[in-house]
């Protein structure tokens, strides 16, 4: 199997060597490292008018959708369901197109027992998501219930490069490693999204690789935020379990704060860097779920090790240590973390995320 190439970063950018990692060339490692930032805006969707003989509402653009219009499209067969984007315990996500148009979006379908009070509560929480307008937040277009199928449908922005979870597992399957430069851009994007949410008094609550999406141009976006997991479980009549990305204070039953999202970000970045979940140490026998939660609470936080052919910068290692501080009072919020030297460096360093993603998904 061919290995992913290593592209060297032009270090004539004025930043100290302390802030940049320079993985040594090692064909056996197959490290993925790309340069030059390209953050192009997403191409605007072509506006289309409703057909005269159509009785179903057809929007001119996706932002024109609302809950009622989405319900009409779902009920009257106005949506073409394309390929699956992901499956979970309580639902799925599919790529969709509005019939008669080229408008593409993602539809999340969640199991939903017929409980009117819970349905109304969840729709209220989802309206908060719709009000968010940030390049680092996935756009939400509308939500509706299909009581005949016991489903909640949520229409949202389609991100062509997929989730960080899918991206790093694709790199791993090809014998590669995701390098520090793409991780730096991802960290900046996630922190920018969290900072935006924090300004609006919203805590994400579920930062993990599958909830960090990237467009084909490399724009980082957060999804699935601000909605109570307990509410979703109650509505679906299921229990999806405790997320292993939860901060220790949350696993222990303590309150959730914005710094809890920072722990989850640190764990996510370390997982992608290592190509595996950081707990327990490599070589340990697979733990039972309750054992893993106990390990996260009671054992020291993981450290990012240096490996043959891979040199992580001291600044990146320090960033992860700050994120994974078990004392939540010492763990900063997203605005403070945006000032960390490692993140500040990657705010300006050019990393061609579009090319990185093209290589990841090329055959």
Curated annotation (Swiss-Prot):
Residue(s) carrying Phosphoserine: 234
SUPFAM superfamilies: Protein kinase-like (PK-like) (SSF56112)
Regulation affecting activity: Activated by mkh1.
Coiled-coil spans in chain: none
EC number assigned by the record: 2.7.12.2
Molecular function terms, GO-annotated: ATP binding; MAP kinase kinase activity; protein serine kinase activity; protein serine/threonine kinase activity; protein tyrosine kinase activity
CDD domains: PKc_Pek1_like (cd06621)
Catalytic center residues: 206
Catalytic activity: L-seryl-[protein] + ATP = O-phospho-L-seryl-[protein] + ADP + H(+); L-threonyl-[protein] + ATP = O-phospho-L-threonyl-[protein] + ADP + H(+); L-tyrosyl-[protein] + ATP = O-phospho-L-tyrosyl-[protein] + ADP + H(+)
Name of a matching Pfam family: Pkinase
Protein kinase domain mapped to chain residues: 79-343
Phosphothreonine: modified positions: 238
One GO term of the biological process aspect: cell integrity MAPK cascade
Keywords on record: ATP-binding, Kinase, Nucleotide-binding, Phosphoprotein, Serine/threonine-protein kinase, Transferase, Tyrosine-protein kinase
Binding positions for ATP per the UniProt entry: 85-93, 108
GO cellular component: cytoplasm; cytosol; division septum; nucleus
Top-level taxon: Eukaryota
PANTHER family: DUAL SPECIFICITY MITOGEN-ACTIVATED PROTEIN KINASE KINASE DSOR1-LIKE PROTEIN, MITOGEN-ACTIVATED PROTEIN KINASE KINAE MKK2
Its biological purpose: Involved in the mkh1 signal transduction pathway that plays a role in cell wall integrity. Activates spm1/pmk1 via phosphorylation.
Family label: Belongs to the protein kinase superfamily. STE Ser/Thr protein kinase family. MAP kinase kinase subfamily.
Protein name: MAP kinase kinase skh1/pek1
